[in-house]
Structure formats: C-alpha cells, structure tokens
Amino acid sequence: KILCSDPFDFIDTYIARYRSPSFKRFGSYNGGLSGYFAYDLVNYTGHLRQFIHQDTLHPLMVLHHIDDFICYDNKYNTYYIATCIYTHDGSIESAYNQAIQCLHTYEDTIINTLSSTSLPYLPAYSESIDLDFTSSPDEFMEKVSQAKTLIEDGEALQVVLSMRALINEPVDPYRFYLKLRQVNPSPYMFYMKHGDLTVTGSSPEIHVKVQDTIATLRPIAGTIAQGKTKIQNKKNKEILLANEKERAEHLMLVDLARNDLSIIAKPGSVQVTQFMQPEDYSHVIHLVSNVTATLNDRISLSDVLRHTFPAGTVTGAPKVRAIEIIDQLEPHPRGIYAGCVGYIGFNNTMDTCITIRTAVFSPQGSFLQAGAGIVYDSIPENEFNEIVHKLKALSVSLPF
C-alpha cells in the first residue's frame, strides 16, 4: 500500500527504477505496473477547479508489480513464459540462473494445469436478469433534462450521464468473466483480483496507448443496436451514419481527443488516421475514430495518462465543465467506473482501456454501470434505452 500526495508522480518515480528491453513476440508488454485507475483520480490531474466527490469504498488506484508473466499467442496457439532479471544487486550470473529455474517451475505448472483442468461448462444462451438501477428511469430522465438545460444555457456541449445497476444475486466473478468472453468479446478483456475486490470487463475502447513514442486515442461515440439480420445490420449502420446528433457528438469527441494529445505531442504530429467508421460489437454498433500523435521528448508515461484522463467519451465536452456537471447530477461518485485499466511497462510502453462494460465485485457492493452522451437535442427515453443496450451483454452473463 503506497501513500503519496500525487499518484501520477508516484508512477513516474516507481517506473524510473526499472528498464527492460522489448520482445515483439510478447507484443508490447514486457513487465511493469498493471491494474486500474479510478475515475476519481481526476482530482489529482490538476484539471479541476475543485475536487469532485470521491469514492471511499475502493482504492483510487491499484497497481501490481508484474515481473513474471505468461503470454498466450492466439494465432499460433503458443505460450511464452517470461521473468524479469534484476541486475542492480548481486551477481548477474546468479540472477540469470535463478530466472531459468523460475521459468522451469512455471513451465511445469502450466503443463500440469492444462492436463488436469478444464473450463466449466457454460450454457450457450441465457436470459438477462432484471437490472436493479440505483435510480429509476424517471429520475435518470429528469437528470437528462437538467443536463440539457445546462447545455442550452451554454455550460457545456455534451455531458455523459451514467446509471449504476446493483448486482444483488450471488455471482462467481470468474465464471461471469468466462461467460462474458463468449457473449461480448472485445479488444480488451480483463479479470483483476485484489484481495476481496474483483474488477472484470470487456472494454471496446482504448483510453490511451503508447508504443515507440506514438500515443493513440480511439474515441468511440455514436451507438445503435445490432440488427437481427445482415441486411438489417447494414441498414442500422446507414441510419447511424446519417444521424446528425450521433455524428455531431462523435466529431466533438474526436476534437477533444486531438486537443488532449496536442498538449503532450510534438507540434504538427497529431493526426486522425480513421474517422467515424461503424464497427460491430456483440450487441451494438459504434462509430469509431483513431487519433495518434508523436510524444514530446520531455513527456513521461504518467504525463500522457494525466493529460488524457479521464477519457472525453465518458465525460463530455468541454471536459472540465462536463466533469463538474456529472458530479452535480449523478447520485454517487463513479469510483472505478469510467477510469481505465491496463499497464505501464518497464520498456516505456503503455496500454490502457476505458473501464466500461465492466463489473465490480466487492463486499462493499457489486455493480454494473454505463452512460449515454447528452446533447442539446437528446431525447431522455432514448438515452435511457442506450444504457440498457450497453448493459445487456453484461447482464446475460450475471447468472453465472
């Protein structure tokens, strides 16, 4: 447990103690700090005029020092085992020999585990459970109306309001995660256990990624339900692309991503490499863009995180005022929801996703949460229905 006045400064200080090479067959990861960053860490970014309400039930940040790890290559069905060798203390030869012994031990463990363990059977289909929201639909729609009034008054262009659904039934988090992999596969699948707290999810969206000094943001904004047939799905994509509200919302968040990166990028290096493309997910279709930039030489990985946190797609724009309005209108601090999950590597890489499509399991209360972007012409009922669509893939996994 680390106590410090600035969590982002702590990350810099800690990471500076270690350096490791990169091995492409492992992807970008080669050991580092891995965990979650709660939304309420925005209080420490320096962006806000005053602190927002902060979750007191769960840590603001949980990071694990990962120096032994296993990589699985899906394409070639191959496992790689890695361990870090520390050369700052004692004999390098001795450290190397200990590392080899460690690798052999892990190899034996993997072989024994694969030969003696099978995944539990999970039915192919299940009915979603009723969602126990902490606010009623009418209460949420009233908050949407209040946000619209503030937007009409010029306070903001967009505000992302979320709803929380409690998990009141006993659920095995690991079985939930396995089912989630089946029904809602996403670019980022994660299962993290820290004491009696488990955070697991299937996030579709990068928060920020850094590799070879290139930072990437990938705004996802604009949503429509999946069609039941290929023809209907194609039609839904056309409807989404023709929806002026969804296009305006998406463009606003692409501009916000460009602005976030411009603060930490070399002049002229910010580029939109993909713009407003419809992408299929298990239950919805999203509009997706890709924004990249070359980092300024003086920028550290925690600087990148600090200046992009939290993501504009979970706040709205302008970001600071949207965060203040969210704090005013939502009934409880967001906590883990809408922060990010991922790693900061010893090889100067970082890969994080936004903590959405995520379940939090803990004795203090287990929940799901999702949001919708509110703009001047939002229809409150439609925004509520969007949240229900986003949570559907999670809720069908809950009976497990």
Regions found by a protein language model. Give the residues of each.
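Extended alpha-helical targeting/anchoring segments
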Residues: 1-400
